[in-house]
Structure formats: structure tokens, C-alpha cells
Swiss-Prot record:
Entry-linked InterPro entries: PIGW/GWT1 (IPR009447)
PANTHER family per the UniProt record, alphabetical: PHOSPHATIDYLINOSITOL-GLYCAN BIOSYNTHESIS CLASS W PROTEIN
Protein name as catalogued: GPI-anchored wall transfer protein 1
Sites carrying sugar chains: 198
Keyword Transmembrane helix: yes
Assigned EC number: 2.3.-.-
Gene name linked to the record: gwt1
GO biological process: GPI anchor biosynthetic process
Membrane topology: Multi-pass membrane protein
Keyword Transmembrane in annotation: yes
TM annotation in the entry: 21-41, 53-73, 74-94, 133-153, 168-188, 249-269, 311-331, 351-371, 389-409, 446-466, 471-491
């Protein structure tokens, strides 16, 4: 890369101060409103069944391009975009009646060989850990925003206040990094719950650490590949983001072994929320009572690997706390929750109340931590670079609130999704209530994230992104979004899962 252009690129994403949380909430609300419109179209009109070319186009427009437009063309007027999306949803809602029963997806043809297995599936009881459409949608929406932002940030059409801040402040991309980790924590609860239900004997910690390290190897390899690619191509870098050598794949790769250690601690402190807050508190105390904060932010970079990568190394504590907070939420919302004395309606109400209370608690802790709060708050600014306690609380509060909103939309539009007595009928209702594109992004989230990184690098090496005008930027971003969506759908159609996470 040309040295002058590289310097311009690095300056373009450096020294930024971010924007307001209210604006970030308004922009991300577009994802929820788009899902609401999709759900109204499907629940009232069965618009996406069968999945025609028109259905694919509208699905792409609502669940991918709406987010792209919210962060670019409508970045200064996100509320207007929300209004444009919610208006047709309300119009359809008021002018149509809810069908008595959801329209069933067309079942695949049965072969003679598969007939016996399909018959068993048709009469089998639903799983105790069901697939939740709202959880699929939440995770996919987060992934769509992340993939769009990592390329859009290199164009001038993407506001600088949405890009990652230098030291202190909040931004859309700062929130996206933490949300990626939080969502990973949410879905990680499924394996933990499954082992509890099966009553399988817990392996010794040493064996679990070895197994989790094996699980981490693909992520660490991806981190090394990214490191050598960036250095080898002389690619523009934002060193204060993670350090000289560290990158986000290393953070993701180191999470599983550390989570296993805290799983062992959970037998003593049976609350992942407490463990999460405990890590955040201890890390914040270390930042405030020692020279650690100044060492991370302003100390000259020495020759040691620790000094060169201090942001990535020390911020890992914050990301671990975020992951455990997500795991705590997953434990609460993934189980079916029904019993002889609790109906599906009561179980769903319980999930909504739990998410609402959790969102309120995390938000209260965040306000007390990051503002004066009428003289009672600590007024500590948010720092993604440090991944300090206010950052952990902000990410946890936002994601819990997002889950609450998506769960509420599903409850209102598809109330019968889990009111079934067989796996087959429940599977049909889950498919009916889930966007094909969102299912695809959720199924191969890490692989799509990797593809997005590769395409981002290819685009930046091919064109001068910071010199592109609005039309050129939008054309490139729509093409890029189409490619990652197409690949996600192709993998989903072929029932291929490339990487775990």
C-alpha cells in the first residue's frame, strides 16, 4: 500500500470521539423495526412463504439494506427511516386479521429410506432446549450490522462518530465488538444446559481446558493469518485498537479456556451475572488504583510483546466479563420453561419478565457507573480500548434490551411458535417465524465474519475508499452486502456449517 495513502487511511480512523448513546439506539432500532415489519408481513400475509424471488428481495431489503441505509444515507435521520419502516407495518396490522393457525411450510418429499426416521420425528416430543426465532434474529441482526460497519467505516459516507473511539466515548462500532462477544456467550449456554439435562458426569477441569483449547485453535489460527496478512501487505492499521500484533480473533480464541475456569468457579458462586460483575469490578479497581490505566493509554510502547499489545491483553478481562454476562442470559432464556404447572404462554411471559428485569438492572448499573446520577454515580467514562466496567455494563444493558425487544416482537406476531406437541410441527412453526437470511447469517456467523474481513481487505486494496463519492460508496457496499448474503444463503441451503461459534 502506498505510504501516503496508508497514512491517510490510518488518520481517517484515528483520534475519534464517538457519538451519543441515544443516537446509537436510534440507529440500531432500525434492525428491530425492520424485523417487526418482516414479522407482520409473514404473520398476517404469509409473504415469505413460499420463498419466492420477491420474498428474497424484500427480505434482503429489510434485514440487510435497511441497516446499511441507517448507517449511511439515513445516518443523520434514523428516526425518519424508523418511521418509514414502521408505518406499513402498522397499516397492515390494523387492516388485517391474524390467521387462526400459522401457515405451514411445505414439507419435503419423503424417501422410502427416510420415511421411518421422519415418522419418528413427526411424533417425537419437542426438544427441552428449543430453537428460538427471536434469538436467531437477534444474533443475525448483530452480525449484519457488524459486517456492514467493518467496510462502511472506510468510506466517508459512514459518519466518523459511528467509528471506534480512540480512548473515551461511545460509538456504534464499539458497541458492535462487545455485542459480538455477548451473543457468543448467549449461545454458549446451550451446551452447558444440554450437559445439565443429560446428567452427564462433568469432566475434570484439566480435560475440559484441553478440549476448550482445541476448540480455540481455529480462531487463533485465523488471528495469525490476519496478523501475517496485515503485516505482509503493509495494510493500514489502527494500532491503539488492540496493539501491534493482537487482533479480535485472538480475543475470541482465548475466551473458551478462561470460560472453563469460571465454569468451575460457578460451582462455588452459582451466578454468572455475579461472576461477570465481579471480573468487571476487580478490573476497574486495578485501573483506578494502580498505574495500569496510564500504562495502557499513554505509556510508550516498549520492546516487549506485552507492551506492544497491552490493549488486547488487558481489555480481555472486560470481554470475558461480557461473555459471562451473555452466558447468564442464555441460561435464562434458552430452556423451554414449560412444565405440568406452567403453560407455554406462562413460560414466554416469564422469559419476557426476566429479560425486562435484567435489562433494567444492567441499565441502572451502567447509569450509576458512568454518570453522576444525582450525586450517587461514579461518573467513569466508557472506554472500549480499556473494556472497562462502564463498557461491560453498557454492552450488557444494550444486548439484554435488544433480546427483550426481539422476544416481544415474536410473542406478538408468532404467539403459537412453541405451542406444539411434536418436533415436526414445532420445526415448521420456527421456520415460518424466522427470516431465511437471518437463519443463514446465524448458522455461519463466524465464517461470514471472516468472509467480510477478507472482502473488506480486498476492497481497500482495490480502490481508494476515502476518496469515493456517495454513489460509488453505496454501490460498493450494496454489492459487498449482496455477496456475503448470497454466500450465507448458499451455505444455509446446502446445510453446511463452516466454523463453530
Amino acid at each position: 500500500m502506498d505510504p501516503d495513502y496508508k497514512a491517510r487511511k490510518e488518520a481517517f480512523v484515528s483520534g475519534l470521539a464517538g457519538g451519543s448513546i441515544l443516537e446509537i439506539n436510534a440507529v440500531t432500532l432500525v434492525a428491530s423495526v425492520s424485523v417487526f415489519l418482516w414479522s407482520i408481513l409473514q404473520s398476517r400475509l404469509s409473504f415469505f412463504t413460499p420463498y419466492s424471488a420477491a420474498a428474497l428481495l424484500v427480505d434482503f431489503l429489510l434485514n440487510v439494506l435497511a441497516i446499511l441505509f441507517a448507517t449511511t444515507l439515513y445516518s443523520s435521520a434514523p428516526l425518519l427511516l424508523n418511521l418509514l419502516l414502521i408505518s406499513p407495518a402498522l397499516l397492515i396490522l390494523l387492516s388485517t386479521k391474524r390467521p387462526r393457525t400459522p401457515v405451514k411450510a411445505k414439507p419435503p418429499r419423503q424417501s422410502a429410506r427416510a420415511g421411518k426416521d421422519d415418522s419418528k420425528h413427526a411424533t417425537a416430543l419437542p426438544e427441552s432446549l428449543p430453537i428460538h426465532p427471536f434469538l436467531t434474529t437477534y444474533r443475525a441482526a448483530m452480525m449484519v450490522i457488524t459486517c456492514i460497519a467493518i467496510l462502511a467505516v472506510d468510506f466517508r459516507i459512514f459518519p466518523r462518530r459511528f467509528a471506534k473511539v480512540e480512548n473515551w466515548g461511545t460509538s456504534l462500532m464499539d458497541l458492535g465488538v462487545g455485542s459480538f462477544v455477548f451473543s457468543g456467550g448467549v449461545v454458549s449456554a446451550r451446551s452447558l444446559l444440554k450437559s445439565r439435562i443429560n446428567g452427564s458426569k462433568r469432566l475434570p477441569l484439566a480435560k475440559r481446558l484441553i478440549a476448550s483449547t482445541r476448540h480455540s485453535i481455529p480462531l487463533l489460527v485465523l488471528g495469525l493469518i490476519r496478523l501475517y496478512s496485515v503485516k505482509g501487505l503493509d495494510y493500514a492499521e489502527h494500532v491503539t485498537e488492540y496493539g501491534v500484533h493482537w487482533n479480535f480473533f485472538f480475543t475470541l480464541g482465548l475466551l473458551p479456556p478462561f470460560v472453563e475456569v469460571f465454569d468451575a468457579l460457578a460451582t462455588i458462586i452459582p451466578s454468572y451475572e455475579v461472576l461477570s460483575v465481579g471480573i468487571a469490578v476487580l478490573y476497574q479497581v486495578a485501573l483506578e488504583s494502580t498505574d495500569l490505566k496510564s500504562y495502557i493509554l499513554v505509556s510508550p510502547r516498549g520492546p516487549s510483546l506485552l507492551s506492544k499489545n497491552r490493549e488486547g491483553v488487558f481489555s480481555f478481562s472486560g470481554y470475558l466479563a461480557i461473555f459471562l454476562a451473555g452466558r447468564a442470559i442464555g441460561i435464562r432464556i434458552i430452556p423451554r420453561g414449560t412444565s405440568f404447572s406452567r403453560s407455554p404462554e406462562q413460560a414466554r411471559r416469564r422469559v419476557l419478565i426476566s429479560l425486562g428485569v435484567q435489562a433494567l438492572v444492567w441499565t441502572t448499573l451502567f447509569v450509576l457507573n458512568s454518570t453522576y446520577a444525582m450525586g450517587y454515580g461514579a461518573n467513569i467514562p466508557v472506554s472500549r480500548r480499556l473494556a472497562n466496567m462502564p463498557y461491560v455494563l453498557w454492552v450488557s444493558a444494550f444486548n439484554t434490551a435488544q433480546l427483550f425487544v426481539f422476544c416481544l416482537i415474536e410473542t406478538l406476531c408468532f404467539p403459537a411458535v412453541h405451542r406444539t406437541t411434536t418436533q415436526e410441527s414445532e420445526s415448521e412453526r420456527v421456520d415460518f417465524a424466522t427470516s431465511r437470511i437471518m437463519s443463514a447469517f446465524n448458522k455461519n456467523s463466524l465464517a461470514i465474519f471472516l468472509l467480510a474481513n477478507l472482502l473488506t481487505g480486498a476492497v481497500n486494496l482495490s480502490i481508494s475508499t476515502i476518496d469515493a463519492n456517495t454513489a460509488q460508496a453505496i454501490a460498493v457496499l450494496i454489492g459487498y452486502s449482496s455477496i456475503i448474503t448470497g454466500v450465507a444463503l448458499a451455505l444455509h441451503h446446502a446445510n453446511i456449517k463452516v466454523l463453530p461459534f
